[in-house]
Amino acid sequence: MKTPTPTPTPTPTPLVLSIALAIALMADANASRLDDVEPPEPGDPSAFSDPPADSAAALNNLLSLPEANLGAFDLPEGEGDRTTPRQENERPPALQTSFNYPTNGAPSPMFGAQPFSQQLLLFEEFGPTRLDPTTPAGLLVFPAPSTGPAPQQDPLDVARSAPSGPLLDAFLKQPGLTPFPGQFANVVDRNPWQQQIELFLNRHIGSAAEGRPPGKGWSHQRWNEFYPQAAYKTAQAGARINSGLRDAMQMHHYSVGEFGPGGLYYNTAGQANTLGTTKGVDTRFHPNMPLQDHKSLWTFDGTLPAKLLMVRYGQPLLMRHYNALPIDPAANHGFGLHTISTHEHNGHAPAESDGYANAFFFPGQYYDYRWPIQLAGYDSINTRAEDPRAAFPCTPGETLWVNDANPGLKTCENGSIRIRGDWRETMSTHWFHDHMLDFTAQNVYKGNAAMMNYYSALDRGNEAFDDGVNLRLPSGSALSWGNRDYDLNLLIADKAWGQNGQLWFNPFNTDGFLGDQILVNWQYKPYLDVRARSYRLRILNGSVSRYLKLALVREIKGSGGEFAGPKGSGLSYARVPFHMIANDGNIMEHAVPFDGSMDLDANGDKQDHNAILPTQGIAERFDIVVNFAKNGIKPGDKLFLLNLQAHDTGKGPKEAIALADVLSEKYQAVIKQTSKGPQWDKGDPTVNKILQFNVKPYSGQDLAMDPAAYEPAKPGKAEGKVMIPLKLHRDNPADIARLAQARHRTFIFGRSDGTDQAPWTVKTDGGFGYHMDPRRLNAAPQLATGPTDAGASGFGTLEIWKIQNGGNGWSHPVHVHFEEGIILSRGGKAPPEWEKWARKDVYRIGSEADGLDNVEVAINFREFAGTYMEHCHNTQHEDNSMLLRWDIEHPGQLQLMPTPLPSWDGVKYVNSAALPTWRNGDGKGPQVKVGK
């Protein structure tokens, strides 16, 4: 029998399985024996410990301990603190204004940039390749920083500089991974930047090559069963010009479909020198604006376009993430921290690869994130891998190791290979981003964010593939899977920049941060050419504190549209309806029409969501299908995506502005001159058009599905077809009975018991309002089972979490890591249509009309154990300190998992302390009565 390739070079430790033993275990064909899943032995650095004898005293002791991330602030003369990275901010508190946009800053200068005068940059694929242990070891090492010309390097100071761009590209382009990845953290090899780091710190350091915490507790769970079949490497780096490094890694190779010669997207940036390449694409928000300095913008590879990871269900993947940021924690233009932890939002990933806030790594190091890319329910549902809806999309000749009734390599037949797990848990649109403790907002704002598309038998990215399983969502058909011709990723986020054009952030205001300009894929008001046919738009709100409310309209010459344009413009506008097909990266049971045919939130108004999306909290993803050939749209037309959601502060949204008022410019922010300098007046400047679509002729055949065939029941029309059904239904008697036995927990997000330094807190199960401490454990569901053999069945551990707003007009988009939940109720009512049919990982609680202040969520815990997080995704709230730790424990676990504390000298562990209700919660079953 063939098996997945075991690691050929395990890190030296007695706990690692030998190659021969791994092969023997796999040949035995028992999933439960492929890997050792027992807790770490005593003596292992990550060994568990007994709960404190006096838990109250242990919890109280945490309040007086040093910050858990203190090791990140080391300076030549000792330790800094969280104020160190703020030292060079161009607007310290003494120079700040009372203006709202941007928060306590001044309007961002435009440098003559005109709206809709630059082409939108589409995402660039990372391009994973097969992880091959026979690839010769690379000769190039991760290049250390050196002095060089600004803005890509510092001309004088190595500790404030970056690696040479050509050297970094040569290293990233080198085939394979050296050293080869293993189950355990690589603590044998040294940090290749050690010499430069020691010169800066003026002392010796004990920094390993890999920043992952050592020991079995943070080793890759089920390493042999989910051995990575594909891999890639990238570096978080300061801004630099793209060299075309990843041109050959694009699936389309700039040769087919709309990305090929003659296609709409063959020219990546609309410039004469960007035909079929990203070489020369720089880091300006608009061609008229300055280049970003390497200390201002920190992106994946250090370049634009923004990056996209494309994965397939069933194929485990490894990302080697290098940290190429400055050694000096103050070399950051006054915001952002050089230590990072990467969270795949919201992957079904083991804790060691989830991006825990206090599992951060340092400049010069890498961290191997291994993402299994398996369907949730792997151990309990469809464990024989017999359901065609749970499958790996493939091309003829491809193979995949599957742990079914006859474990081994399976060959691609009829375009797919069946895999284990619950097909109802299929995900689609994700992203990954930094999660550094206390610095998530700053680091993500600064560029540490990429998008991630999951492909599956149901959502394979080939609209022509008709096997009765594939939903045939808009995509294209030139490739077997993963076509992006008519499938667009849109990262929308507000930003601000100073008078020199460099990105600016205010880290001093703990209420939240608002920029005064919205960028789409890091560009100021771009345009995009689209064909007259259907498209899928994957929309991510990547802001710090700003909610969005997006609308889509068509511009009409003359007065024939529903909405008048600005006075004297001779223009009017018509709504462009669409369907939502996925929410938070999860394809829904039904495609929800935003066309005025349904009262989507039962408020008596069908028009309030006609061509207008609901409020979109930070980190929420909405996938919509738009047809640019219907509703009167024709080639030559212009369409606009607008934001209608106004804010005054970062605490939460104000009101949505009427679409008519925005289009007529009755509502329009303007800059006025004041005694304190220029200031935005008469509204929020981001309430405006943000993206223009130019419709071009289409001569092909649109083979994509019609979302109208999948709508829920509505007046005059019966329920349509189902895309992906929910695993639980709120009105199903069997599900109601199951929910009644589920453990219940309550989390209240507010400011109770907060301090000036850490104002935002979370109360758990009626307890004290704590600020974040990674050593404190708030909740710990236990797995129902360990790894299972083919034929096993079950439901996993089911709990109900109530997420409650603490009041006072604030709003919080709460994110629970690891698993999606089904909203049972929102504010004591049934959820609106866009949540009724959805699985979610961000739960917006607030006073906005389509929000309400609490949700009860049914959520499962399966397959993996370890330490995870729950937090407000207004990341300025999270960083100050609206974040908590929860663990998934092994079956029957009695001891507590320890807490990693990283530093330049390695990672040490300390014991954890748990709340009194950490295992039992506060009851059983739903506790909110749902009204009509």
Where are the model-predicted features located?
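N-terminal, post-signal-peptide metal-ligating segments of extracellular/periplasmic oxidoreductases
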Residues: 32-361, 366, 507-537, 597-603, ...
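Charged, glycine/proline-rich intrinsically disordered loops and linkers
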Residues: 273-284, 376-420, 577-583, 587-604, ...
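Histidine- and aromatic-rich segments of cupredoxin/plastocyanin-like copper-binding domains
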Residues: 346-378, 492-718, 831
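Surface-exposed, non-catalytic interaction/assembly patches
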Residues: 460-480, 675-679, 699-736
